[in-house]
């Protein structure tokens, strides 16, 4: 990696990263857990790429629903806020200035902008196509997940909510982990942390959308829901570790947090449009690893740039 991250890495220490991880998860959990419970109790829809159109068209039920939605959305800023705190404690204002410089770095090879559009489709399309071909996603049921007049609002909303996780994940955490680990190991570790950060919402989503047979004894419902949550959390962690490799490839080759922000937005928007049957979740989870393995083979595990840390070509066998 080039010297642009020196202001962050200069004050490197393990406790700072631990502080970052705890602060990111804690801030978000404080926002997400209570709002998820209140939403479930009152039948409120929480904002997400999958509910955006429904919420935009139906509106909020009442003032409490609006407050819950706002607090839930604020929870997405946990990684960003934690990064600001950790960087300031480590290296002060210069580190924060460097982070914001990388957040606004838009002058990169145009091919990276193409990749952030194409890659989400390459990852999501296989499950979508298999769903149609197998009948699990009947053509007769296909509709636009988001009306075209809401596409731009969805893009902007995702850029400035979920996209702004990236100053934390790729702007701070990834460079910190790469001080100790190669790109592959840093990506997998970050992917697991990133997934754990999502767990309160994933648990809520799994429980709120679970469909159990009507003849299931009431005493078994809790156990079945717990099993479904555990399975979903595991699959999410595996999938997120794979997609974290893709983010590392994008970031290490551009040193642009903006590219990561736009890729995050693009992935969420495409996923919202190409929804498929829950029965194909495993395929959706595997596809990031298919892409990750290709990138690791082509660009090398050490930096994912085709070069090793000594600046020479990283040849893979």
What are these regions (language model features)?
Residues 153, 169-170, 243:
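Functionally critical, cavity-lining and gating residues within the transmembrane helices
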Residues 188, 214-289:
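Functionally important transmembrane alpha-helices
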Residues 17-20, 113, 172, 186-187, ...:
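Alpha-helical transmembrane segments and their helix-entry boundary regions
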Residues 126, 160, 173, 243-247:
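Hydrophobic/aromatic residues in alpha-helical transmembrane segments
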């Amino acid at each position: 990696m080039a010297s642009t991250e020196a202001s962050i890495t200069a004050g490197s220490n393990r406790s700072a990263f631990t502080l970052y991880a705890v602060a990111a998860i804690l801030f978000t959990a404080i926002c997400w857990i209570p709002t998820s419970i209140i939403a479930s109790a009152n039948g409120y829809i929480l904002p997400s790429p999958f509910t955006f159109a429904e919420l935009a068209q139906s509106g909020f039920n009442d003032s409490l629903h609006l407050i819950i939605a706002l607090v839930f959305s604020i929870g997405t800023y946990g990684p960003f806020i934690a990064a600001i705190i950790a960087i300031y404690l480590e290296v002060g204002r210069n580190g924060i200035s460097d982070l914001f410089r990388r957040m606004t770095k838009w002058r990169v090879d145009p091919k990276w902008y193409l990749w952030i559009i194409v890659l989400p489709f390459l990852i999501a399309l296989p499950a979508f196509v298999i769903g149609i071909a197998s009948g699990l996603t009947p053509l007769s049921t296909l509709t636009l997940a988001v009306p075209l007049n809401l596409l731009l609002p969805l893009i902007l909303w995702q850029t400035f909510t979920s996209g702004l996780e990236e100053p934390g994940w790729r702007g701070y955490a990834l460079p910190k982990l790469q001080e100790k680990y190669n790109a592959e190991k840093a990506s997998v570790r970050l992917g697991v942390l990133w997934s754990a950060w999502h767990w309160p919402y994933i648990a809520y989503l799994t429980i709120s959308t679970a469909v159990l047979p009507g003849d299931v004894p009431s005493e078994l419902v809790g156990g079945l829901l717990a099993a479904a949550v555990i399975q979903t959390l595991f699959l999410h962690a595996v999938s997120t570790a794979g997609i974290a490799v893709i983010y590392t490839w994008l970031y290490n080759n551009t040193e642009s947090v903006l590219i990561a922000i736009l890729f995050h937005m693009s992935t969420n928007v495409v996923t919202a449009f190409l929804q498929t049957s829950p029965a194909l979740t495993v395929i959706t989870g595997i596809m990031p690893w298919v892409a990750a393995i290709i990138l690791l083979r082509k660009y090398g595990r050490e930096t994912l740039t085709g070069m090793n840390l000594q600046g020479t070509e990283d040849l893979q066998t």
